[in-house]
């Protein structure tokens, strides 16, 4: 196993089981980064973006914030892309959305993952990406957020609908969802947005899931925005808005691991 001395392996395993004091949390982070480096997943001391392959059911981009944030149990932000970014070339995922904004200089105080699918989003496979992050980094599991656009908007609501107990909040842009998930989604703070002139995905797709949520609890955790005169592509600008990230990061959810 990368030529690790047996005593070092025992030591690292021991550290991972110790109480999460600030000292041990920091040592755990260093140990995990050491292991990741063994598999070719290496990072410098500052915020870094790295493609990850063969570690989950999807290949994905992994963004680690600066060390000072990483050592303080950062939240997790999952970005699910739309159909135009589908395929097996991860560079496509940089065309718009959260990863694009990071590359333009946006500082996001979270571990960010942006998986790529070639044929629609499977919430179980998305969960495998989240599981990788939870296993390898000392993140705040009470602050897991999901955001997606178009097909990624559907993926966001499908993931939150299947795993509502794991999602602190989610934003779905010009997508839709399964009305059977309405009552599960009603327990998650959601911001659903759709343009009134969207011809690629009609606004009725969002309206259906909004009604399903409202029928469960009146939509007490729901924020719905119908953007008058906006078409499908107009929603991309939300990734450039501070408001999106500020809204998401205000929420927490107690997760029973």
Residue locations for each model-derived region?
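A domain-start/cap signature at the N-terminus of enzymes
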Residues: 2, 8-9, 22, 43-76, ...
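Sec-dependent N-terminal signal peptides
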Residues: 30-39
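Gly/Ser-rich "nucleophile elbow"/oxyanion-hole loop immediately N-terminal to the catalytic nucleophile
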Residues: 67-72, 121-150
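Active-site machinery of serine-nucleophile hydrolases
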Residues: 76, 80-125
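C-terminal catalytic histidine-bearing segment of alpha/beta-hydrolase fold enzymes
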Residues: 181, 199-200, 204-257
